[in-house]
């Protein structure tokens, strides 16, 4: 079974938690796209929900699938967000942002009563950090911000090269919010909550891809079926 088929299975399992009338956060990435497509099928069958997309790509996908959209300016809270992840540990802390939407993803997740993370089981890891950690930064004063990121990482006992993410045109990748992304190849992050706090204390850092304490459940698909992990 292909990775893409497993992603779709995880998305289908998460869809079982959606109820009529819900306000949903719609994630970004290949697994979240499966969820949006499957949700669209349910909407066409009569399900009544509204969604808040976490990126312009997801917005376009949701509209194409016939899902009604709203914004966090128009609703106070969301009932549920369903999103993918680049890495998940047993405590349901995550690395996200491989698709470049980490800021909006974190804003939407924080505004939700529950967050379900969907992935194929290869994303479950003992320790976060093998996947490069995305850090969204302001373009102004980049060199100073990079030095501060290196210092923050060192204080948390993690080291590794930093690279500015490039787009397909060879120039700096620009997020929906107009920022740049630095990818930190750290290998292993022993204390993710501390590193997240240290990074977000840097003036040039807009947000980081460590999602701490936001996910309430992970739905993981593997060759032997669906595995559910709930936050302790």
Swiss-Prot record:
Active-site residues, record numbering mapped to chain: 105 (proton acceptor)
InterPro entries: NagB/RpiA_transferase-like (IPR037171), Ribose-5P_isomerase (IPR050262), Ribose5P_isomerase_typA_subgr (IPR020672), Ribose5P_isomerase_type_A (IPR004788)
Keyword Isomerase: yes
Pfam families linked to this entry: Rib_5-P_isom_A
Molecular function GO labels: ribose-5-phosphate isomerase activity
GO process annotations (BP): pentose-phosphate shunt, non-oxidative branch
Domain of life of the source: Bacteria
Known EC number: 5.3.1.6
The protein's assembly and partners: Homodimer.
Function: Catalyzes the reversible conversion of ribose-5-phosphate to ribulose 5-phosphate.
Protein name per the record: Ribose-5-phosphate isomerase A
């Amino acid at each position: 079974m292909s990775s893409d088929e497993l992603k779709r299975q995880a998305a289908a399992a998460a869809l079982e938690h959606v109820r009529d009338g819900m306000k949903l956060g719609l994630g970004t990435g290949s697994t979240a796209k499966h969820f949006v497509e499957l949700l669209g099928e349910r909407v066409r069958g009569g399900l009544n929900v509204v969604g808040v997309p976490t990126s312009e790509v997801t917005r376009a996908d949701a509209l194409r699938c016939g899902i009604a959209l709203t914004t966090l300016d128009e609703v106070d809270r969301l009932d549920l967000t369903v999103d993918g992840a680049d890495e998940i540990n047993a405590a349901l802390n995550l690395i996200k942002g491989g698709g470049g939407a980490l800021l909006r993803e974190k804003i939407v997740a924080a505004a939700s009563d529950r967050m379900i993370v969907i992935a194929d089981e290869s994303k479950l890891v003992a320790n976060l950090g093998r996947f490069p950690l995305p850090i969204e930064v302001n373009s102004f004063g980049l060199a100073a911000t990079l030095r501060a990121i290196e210092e923050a990482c060192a204080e948390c006992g993690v080291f590794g090269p930093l690279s500015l993410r490039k787009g397909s045109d060879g120039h700096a990748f620009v997020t929906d919010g107009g920022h740049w992304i630095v990818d930190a190849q750290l290998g292993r992050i022993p204390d993710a909550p501390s590193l997240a706090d240290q990074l977000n204390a840097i003036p040039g850092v807009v947000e980081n891809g460590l999602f701490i304490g936001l996910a309430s459940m992970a739905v993981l698909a593997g060759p032997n079926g669906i595995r559910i992990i709930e936050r302790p």
